[in-house]
Amino acid sequence: MAKYQCPDCQYIYDECKGEPHEGFQPNTNWGEIPEEWACPDCAVRDKIDFKMLADPRCEITQLKQNDPVIKQDNNIIEDTLSEPSILSAELEFTAEKISITDERENTPDNKVERRSQSQAVRRSSVKKIKNNKR
């Protein structure tokens, strides 16, 4: 899929991304865009004036159907797995587990208290100092 650039304002139409605001979904080929279409940024140039920049393959078309697809625009991660909710649940569980491990400390009476890492470090330092004085 190729990229096309407006010679006036440098707007780039990427076939992989499409132009949803103009009604062109991702993977819309340049040939599918009407001839009367004009640059959405400057409206000065018509489709025929655009210059082809490159012919890269979209990540979507190169990957197998069940491979996750990662788009780096705005740090958005999308995946094409048949069960994306399972992956999301696993990530949430892992993140929660890491968070709990980092933020919680067991007290002698088995109550769980939330502590920042700096509080935990200070408490452990105090314990070391007390043990060294004995």
Swiss-Prot record:
Fe cation binds at residues 6, 9, 39, 42. Coiled coil: none annotated. The keyword Electron transport applies. Binds 1 Fe(3+) ions per subunit. GO terms for biological process: alkane catabolic process. Residues 1-53 form the Rubredoxin-like domain. Keywords: Cytoplasm, Electron transport, Iron, Metal-binding, Transport. GO terms for cellular component: cytoplasm. One of its GO terms (molecular function) is electron transfer activity. InterPro entries: Rubredoxin-like_dom (IPR024934), Rubredoxin_dom (IPR024935), Rubredoxin_ET (IPR050526), Rubredoxin_Fe_BS (IPR018527). Residues 99-134 are annotated as: Disordered. Residues 124-134 have a biased composition (Basic residues). Residues 99-116 have a biased composition (Basic and acidic residues). It is found in: Cytoplasm. It holds the Pfam family Rubredoxin. Involved in the hydrocarbon hydroxylating system, which transfers electrons from NADH to rubredoxin reductase and then through rubredoxin to alkane 1 monooxygenase. Belongs to the rubredoxin family. This is Rubredoxin-2. The gene is alkF.
